[in-house]
Amino acid sequence: MYIAGVMSGTSLDGIDVALVRIEGSGVESKVELIHFTTVPFCNDIKSEIQQALSIENSNVQLICSLNFKLGLCFANAVKEVCKEANFSLEQLDLIGSHGQTIYHQPKQDGNRIPSTLQIGEPAVIAYETNTTVISNFRTMDMAAGGQGAPLVPYSEVILYRDPSKNRLLQNIGGISNVTVIPNQQSDQNVIAFDTGPGNMIIDEVCQRLFQLSYDQNGEIAKQGRVVDEILTYCMSHPFLKMNPPKSTGREQFGEKFASELLKRFEKHSKENILTTVTMFTANSIVHHYKKFILPYYEIDEVILGGGGSYNSTLVEMLRNGLKDENCAIFIQEDIGYSSEAKEAIAFAILANETHHCNPSNVPSATGAKQSVVFGNITFPPV
């Protein structure tokens, strides 16, 4: 089957689309990446998404309209990946669309029950591409008592499980998450959870202090030094003390967190603040390894993916934090994969599993009561 995996993440960089060929299903799946592209959001759409994400500035009219606008954007992104690959849209069998997360509440808060909302209307995508769309991947896991995240461990087992090596798959997107993949002979469980911020705080600080969308290759962070009082403040966040399974998002590490941090520590230099929040991402990852993973698993390799793996300052901080742990650290490209395409490929795989009616959540990662089939299916017009 030819499947397009579509992902718009918490970093708001744009729409990632992976055109993938998949044979079979389950752990025997054969997955081939044909082409990958990122279609940037235009400034107007990005601004509307940022407004929709803000509890103070959002409204139901905006979210309703944006749902359909993003559906059209996602459909156009699918057309673009096919065009770049010289691949006929008519050959496409399926689209797996994660959508744009507007709000994610993994645990009950007062009278607010666990819930999640991703937008990007699948009916619009199906109509515009004349292709069946699988979307809304998180909701069934949450209906079964899970946190609806992380979603990608199932696909990571298919792609990265090794005959003899125990691996950690560390994704550093807007939020960071880790998947522990024991080797094929092991009887230990796959576990996965969010480790905290990835690029989200770094990007927010860059935008506010340097008028840049991100710190390219970590060049600015390389110029500063870590400020202990800022790092201590960050590392005291309650999320770091919670036991897995757990998930987080912009609600805890987004604009509000960055705004309060900058106000509290405004006396410090811009470079030092950016260096310190970069170290916060690295330290929060290392903290979770040492507390929740390394006492129970012997890890041979750590494989980094997502946009944060291109931040050499962040990667060096991670290497230093793990230098005594006797595990090799790679990025996706070192082992023949793409850091950028990883999550879009995952949603192509998850769409394929839903098409075959296979459960694809990992209850040991999400906390769900049982394995479930992900997603809603939207058919194109006859």
UniProtKB/Swiss-Prot annotation:
Amino-acid positions noted as binding ATP in the UniProt annotation, renumbered to this chain: 9-16
Gene Ontology molecular function, alphabetical: ATP binding; kinase activity; phosphotransferase activity, alcohol group as acceptor
Pathway: Amino-sugar metabolism; 1,6-anhydro-N-acetylmuramate degradation; Cell wall biogenesis; peptidoglycan recycling
E.C. designation(s): 2.7.1.170
GO BP: any one term: 1,6-anhydro-N-acetyl-beta-muramic acid catabolic process
A Pfam cross-reference name: AnmK
Catalysed conversion reaction: 1,6-anhydro-N-acetyl-beta-muramate + ATP + H2O = N-acetyl-D-muramate 6-phosphate + ADP + H(+)
Domain of life: Bacteria
Gene3D superfamilies per the UniProt record, alphabetical: 3.30.420.40
Keyword entries, A-Z: ATP-binding, Carbohydrate metabolism, Kinase, Nucleotide-binding, Transferase
Keyword Manganese included in the entry's annotation: no
Catalytic EC class: transferase
InterPro entries given in the database record: Anhydro_N_Ac-Mur_kinase, ATPase_NBD
Family label: Belongs to the anhydro-N-acetylmuramic acid kinase family.
Function text: Catalyzes the specific phosphorylation of 1,6-anhydro-N-acetylmuramic acid (anhMurNAc) with the simultaneous cleavage of the 1,6-anhydro ring, generating MurNAc-6-P. Is required for the utilization of anhMurNAc either imported from the medium or derived from its own cell wall murein, and thus plays a role in cell wall recycling.
NCBIfam families xrefs: PRK09585.2-1, PRK09585.3-2
Name of protein: Anhydro-N-acetylmuramic acid kinase
Organism the protein comes from: Bacillus anthracis
High-level lineage: Bacteria, Bacillati, Bacillota, Bacilli, Bacillales
